[in-house]
Amino acid sequence: MIIVGAGVGGLTAAALLVKAGCRVLVLDRNPHPGGTAYVYKRKGFTFPMGPLGFGTPSVVIKNLQSLDGEDLKLSPIQYRIKAFDLDIPISHPFPKMIEELIKLFPTEDETIKNFFRNMEEIVSAMNDPDMDPNHSILGKAMSESAMEYLSGLVKDWRLRRVLGSIGTQEPYSSLPLLSAMWNLISNQGIWYPVGGMRSLCDRMVQAVSGHRANRDKFGEIKLGTEVEEVRIERGRVLGVILRNGAKIDSAAVISNADYKNTFLKLIDSKFVSDEWYRAVMRARQTSSNLQLCLGVDANGVDLSSFKEADRIIYRRNQADLSGQIDWSAEEIHPEALVCQELEVSLLSKNDRKLGPEGTEIIVIRTEAEHFHFSRFRPTWRKRIPEYQAYKMRLGRALIQEVENLIPGLGRAILVMDIATPLTFEEQGGRSGGAVAGWSWNYEDGSDYRPRELVRTPIQGFYMAGYQAFSALFMGGIPTAMESGRRAARAVLQGDGPVENIMIPVTE
């Protein structure tokens, strides 16, 4: 059994197949396991590659317990929105959220109550969507976008943005997806694993390769080993070809790469229909991020903004909300970048072991478009000289802006690392640097529940990872784990290929 990619989905599938008695080989071009859930080090500091926590903890705990029988200790993550001259806690169950928002928007009290009542109704309906009453509720919810719904409900533009994006943006998603996200962040909560994201990945690695004494249960992970091509003949998978030309046979292959990397790079287009190929090529994904990781001297910064928060969704109070960044320009003005929504995380508050004693780790993220940065890359993993200076200008602007939240930040920096969409693409294996899978925009999808995308048109070839479902209703890590579980089950059951195109594609 071959699994391409040692991300969370691939490791979950591998561990379950090993547990079932299969011999499994996991191949990954990176020098580390875990995909973007892993971490990297800079001068004694440990920085994140991707997720800073996860929702739907029951799925993560259940899957890990099925792998090794051990429990998982978690600590809650508290979110706040600081924008529009408002300070809003959002990591509270719906009743408390109603109470907090009515304090800030007293004239919108009935609107706020109706909104969360509707969110609760949609969440409940999604738990059993095939029941007749629930089917009707969800069908109605999909008939208009979150923007259309809230524009007719909310008078205050600030409240519309908070309710519609759980942040500072205008509403953009469907109502079912919005309700799922509110349910995650408020009712279920976002959680950080005690021991950090690396310990989570290492535990999954142990579940794959920790059975070497038992010859019947053998899993092997080969890092730094890149798959060049998936071998296919007459509609059936045969194995893979490595970048060094070596061929490895296997009657089943699971790809933990995303859909575009898999079907546009690893598989010759002649092995799938034109319709399938076009669907994958045209399917829209989320945008990427510009990420700034900082190791700072704790004595040099004022962290009082984080007294009741671990993560802050921030936007400058007087930011111009009328215009958008022109990402088609050769360079964007740093001032335009800092007027966007920023996510500022005090990561060391959740994990004191990430940096040396007396230090803190701060992560700043904001949305960025991959195509804007592509001109800085002449070839894969190469950059033109202007790239470093440009991303440093953007990073310095973000630091200056975040000093409104964290006074003294600029002078207290000990280590700084900046990742662009090119980094997320090359180091994270995410096509286009996309950080959250398929597009979340209402016009790009019509699901009120995630469609499983594990099976493919090729016999014996399956998908795992955050794109193996049509939407991240559970959040990234739980979705990846669940996809790995279902991919392993599909292999063991010998599930056949699919004919219908289930990928979310805008016509």
Q: How should each PLM-predicted stretch be described?
A:
Residues 1-118, 439:
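N-terminal glycine-rich phosphate/pyrophosphate-binding loop and immediately adjacent elements
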Residues 84-177:
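Rossmann-like flavin
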Residues 156-170, 339, 343, 404-470:
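A glycine-rich dinucleotide-binding beta-alpha-beta segment and adjacent secondary-structure elements
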Residues 182-243:
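Helical element adjacent to the flavin cofactor pocket in flavoenzyme catalytic cores
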Residues 226, 232, 492-507:
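Active-site-proximal substrate-binding core of FAD-dependent oxidoreductases
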Residues 228-356:
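Mid-domain catalytic core of redox enzymes
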Residues 341-439:
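FAD-dependent oxidoreductase catalytic-site/capping-region signature
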